[in-house]
A protein has these predicted regions:
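C-terminal capping/gating helix-and-loop segments adjacent to ligand/active sites or protein-protein/ligand interfaces
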Residues: 1, 60, 278-285, 297-350
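Extracytoplasmic "Venus flytrap"/periplasmic binding protein-like
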Residues: 1-51, 58, 85-94, 190-194, ...
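A structural signal for short loop-to-beta-strand junctions that line the ligand-binding cleft
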Residues: 8-9, 14-17, 47-83, 112-118, ...
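Hinge/lid segment of periplasmic solute-binding proteins
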Residues: 23-76, 100, 106, 126-128, ...
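Short, solvent-exposed loop/beta-turn-alpha elements that line the ligand-binding surface or hinge
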Residues: 39-51, 135-157, 207-209, 221-232, ...
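Extracytoplasmic/periplasmic solute-binding protein
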Residues: 64-70, 75, 100-147, 192
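Extracytoplasmic/periplasmic substrate-recognition and gating elements
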Residues: 87, 168, 207-275
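Glycine-centered hinge/linker elements that transmit conformational signals in sensory
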Residues: 103-105, 145-175
């Protein structure tokens, strides 16, 4: 709905001065001339100097900065420490084989392993990391120019893993009938051991009765992939953008840049980390009280680990192909698609754009 409204305003030349967009939409807006090229202004005001390394130049078109990170897009699997303990799970899984062992133990204990809701097709964030471990970014140029098909051996392996998860009873039985918010309620209610989500849920989890019981891990690695495995999505999600019209006013652009200097600077970063229990986009040198903010502390530890930061595959695809990939993955989760059918579905969408 927000994207639709912004598209209508763009057509009427009535866009706000500063506004938020998903990255894929922001890139489309920039290509249509609706957004300002921020490259020189960001350099002049030194704003990029404050950002986390994985967030610098996080939204570019033809090498030009067109957006600034609004949040840290950090995704993976949250888990309930108590339910893991009840099932006799002593170590957080790292490999896919260890992940399936966790699923088996949870099922044996009568505990739903992973809650996820197919009614909201965008809610497969941790699975995007899995796709990246099968070489998504290495194949991206080929996917776009047609030299590589979505129906390739690595992506078939990805979809086969999702299929095997379904066959093993990984997903909540009502997956087809619930969405993201219902899945989150199941997790917070102690009715599922794992939940696929991201940093935006820190606030809700911190305010819950089970805050101290929540852990986090990046999701399984795969021995049948030749690509980098120790990677995690630690990048920009949506972005703040400046309309082309606003950038024509030097005083207005100066005011925007001065605000961003504060927002992404030391004081703004402190406010975000300490007062909102969110992950800041800039380097935070303070100390989080783990007893008061156990989930935030857990996430900051993961953010600062030595796993390589990558962006969300969604940000590198058109909206149509990205949502098609979401549908394909949920299609395999629910048994509607075979791995080959899922890959062909996304390939048909991608080929229409070549």
């Amino acid at each position: 709905e927000h994207n639709t409204q912004m598209t209508l305003l763009a057509g009427e030349n009535k866009l706000p001065d500063v506004f938020w967009l998903e990255q894929a939409t922001a890139k489309e807006f920039a290509q249509n001339g609706y957004l300002s090229d921020l490259t020189d202004a960001l350099d002049q005001y030194g704003i990029n100097d404050s950002l986390l390394p994985g967030l610098v130049h996080s939204c570019t078109v033809d090498g030009k900065d067109v957006g600034m990170p609004s949040e840290v897009m950090m995704v993976g699997f949250y888990y309930n420490k108590d339910l893991f303990q009840q099932a006799g799970i002593e170590e957080v899984p790292v490999t896919y084989e260890e992940f399936l062992d966790v699923v088996d133990k949870l099922n044996a204990a009568g505990i739903t392993p992973l809650t996820v809701g197919a009614q909201d097709n965008y809610s497969i964030w941790a699975f995007e990391t899995m796709l990246a471990r099968y070489g998504f970014f290495e194949k991206l140029d080929g996917l776009k120019d047609g030299s590589i098909s979505w129906n390739n051996e690595d992506f078939i392996h990805y979809f086969e893993k999702v299929e095997e998860m379904r066959e093993k009873g990984t997903f909540t039985k009502d997956i087809s009938n619930i969405g993201y918010f219902e899945a989150k309620e199941q997790f917070l209610g102690g009715n599922a051991a794992m939940f696929n989500s991201g940093a935006w849920d820190i606030g809700d989890f911190e305010g819950s009765d089970m805050a101290s019981k929540i852990g986090f891990f990046w999701g399984p690695t795969f021995s049948d992939s030749q690509y980098e495995q120790q990677i995690g999505i630690k990048a920009s999600g949506g972005v703040y953008v400046v309309s082309s019209k606003a950038a024509e006013d030097p005083a207005l652009l100066d005011a925007i840049m001065q605000f961003w200097q504060f927002y992404y600077g030391e004081e703004g970063t402190r406010i975000i980390a300490e007062d909102t229990a969110a992950l800041p986009c800039s380097t935070y040198n303070g100390q989080i009280d783990e007893s008061q903010h156990p989930v935030l502390s857990t996430m900051i530890t993961a953010l600062n680990d030595d796993w390589k930061a990558v962006t969300e595959p969604f940000n590198s695809l058109s909206s149509n192909v990205a949502y098609g990939y979401f549908d394909a993955t949920f299609g395999v989760m629910t048994g509607v698609y075979t791995p080959e059918q899922a890959a062909d579905y996304v390939e048909n969408l991608q080929s229409a754009e070549r």
